[in-house]
């Protein structure tokens, strides 16, 4: 059965993930290293992991499998999800794929280096309504695609 794992710290689309999951009766694991407001929703499993680098990522990566979806803005976590056969979506709905993850990791490293050397100061553009809409469409499409393929 497909499950959705949300890397919830700084995730702007938690509610949208729950909305799509509810439509399909899927469990959503909202994983964070800080407290969250309880939802009381029967399909939502709120997981609070200890503080520390990559603890939430590790929790997700250890559990996600080939029929699952990982929602994250963390490119290394997306790479780990893909290695396990899971689908991975960014907050803006853009899918991470085997074909794109290498370039995404390289760009992440380049941008970090540019920030460290002072050659780049800002982040990306602000999260927009279009990003939210793209995310909803992409998550729906991903759920449908997983449901159409045979189980591993």
From Swiss-Prot:
Signal peptide: none annotated. Pfam families: DUF188. Residues 114-152 are annotated as: Disordered. It comes from the Bacteria. Residues 128-140 have a biased composition (Basic and acidic residues). PANTHER family: UPF0178 PROTEIN YAII (PTHR35146:SF1). Belongs to the UPF0178 family. NCBIfam families: PRK00124.1 (NF001095). This is UPF0178 protein Plav_1521.
